[in-house]
A protein has these predicted regions:
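N-terminal, active-site-proximal structural segment of metallo-dependent hydrolase catalytic domains
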Residues: 18-97, 109, 267-272
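N-terminal post-signal-peptidase region of extra-cytosolic proteins
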Residues: 53, 60-68, 102-106, 200-206, ...
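Sec-dependent N-terminal signal peptides
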Residues: 3-15
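Active-site-proximal beta-strand elements of phosphoester/diester hydrolases
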Residues: 23-36, 130, 148-157
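Active-site beta-strand/loop signature of hydrolases that rely on acidic residues for catalysis
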Residues: 26-31, 68-91, 120, 151-154, ...
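Solvent-exposed loop/turn segments at secondary-structure junctions
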Residues: 31-34, 86-89, 109-113, 125-127, ...
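Structured beta-strand-rich core segments of catalytic domains in phosphoester-bond hydrolases
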Residues: 85-148, 154
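Metal-dependent phosphoester-hydrolase catalytic domains
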Residues: 19, 168-176, 182-272
Length: 272
């Protein structure tokens, strides 16, 4: 129990500074299977319907929408990448529920489970220019404070290396990769793991077999990054001190996600 308390306190201290005034940052949040309540014709999501084994009705759906929006608003960064949303209507519902005035980009991933990526952003801070879709990844090229910035959200993408080969051909391309990068040899493209400090300190964003793991990470070629870590608030955890999941062993718990968000931010309005 003492070890758990020390871990949680270290996370709280690490994330408190992310609320500083004029920093710019990007977060990534695996929302853990946020389906709507309507059966799909293209993949099997019957479990997440009112008649399915999870009893996924409009009340449970609306509750989770509000929870995800609360997390996004709490993070309060100009760009938040999401993974695990079923479709564009789900993204619209999240954005509508947010207090922050987010615009969004959504693309259908056409995966076996029907789960997509979305990028929420403040339109006065990040200016998207081009969207590139890859299996297991969403890449958005744009500008932030008159500097080129490319944001890649990924979840076990097998084509991430090919995408990076394309992106690295551009000069002065500032790139941030967030999510589950699998076994990517990121050093090949001169990237560093911005979340390495959190990993070495034993911090994680998911519990596997009773142990914290940093399932998602942040990779970047930007040298001026100020901090990258796991985002934590007490209400994101259950009474055991683990991520407050929507379902646990098939039982509805009404929580947020079995993952915690991760983030990277920069002081002085993008000093890169």
């Amino acid at each position: 129990m003492r070890a758990l308390l020390v871990f949680l306190l270290s996370l709280l201290c690490a994330t408190a500074s992310a609320q500083k005034g004029n920093s710019f940052g990007v977060a990534y949040y695996n929302v853990d299977k946020l389906y709507d309540t309507i059966p799909s014709r293209f993949y099997d999501d019957r479990a997440y319907t009112p008649a399915g084994c999870f009893g996924w009705d409009s009340n449970r759906y609306t509750h989770k929408i509000k929870q995800v929006a609360a997390v996004v608003d709490s993070i309060a960064l100009p760009v938040v990448a999401l993974y695990g949303v079923e479709n564009e209507q789900v993204v619209k519902d999240i954005v509508t529920a947010c207090r922050g005035d987010y615009s969004y980009i959504h693309r259908t991933a056409n995966g076996y489970d029907g789960l997509d990526f979305a990028l929420l952003y403040f339109a006065d801070c990040f200016y998207p220019d081009k969207v590139i879709e890859r299996q297991g990844a969403l890449c958005v090229e744009g500008e932030a404070f008159d500097r080129p910035l490319t944001i890649v959200a990924t979840h076990r993408s097998r084509s991430l290396g090919v995408l990076l080969d394309e992106l690295k051909t551009a000069e002065d391309n500032n790139i941030i990769i967030l999510g589950d990068a699998g076994k990517l040899n990121f050093k090949k493209w001169a990237f560093v793991e911005a979340t390495l400090g959190a990993r070495l300190a034993g911090r994680g964003n998911r519990i596997l077999r009773g142990v914290w793991h940093l399932q998602d990470c942040v990779l970047t070629n930007i040298e001026a990054q100020n901090r990258s870590d796991v985002y934590i608030r007490p209400w994101l955890l259950d009474r055991r001190g683990v991520p407050f999941a929507t379902f646990q062993g098939g039982k509805y718990c009404g929580g947020y996600s079995s993952y915690l968000p991760i983030y990277i931010y920069f002081d002085n309005l993008f000093a890169f």
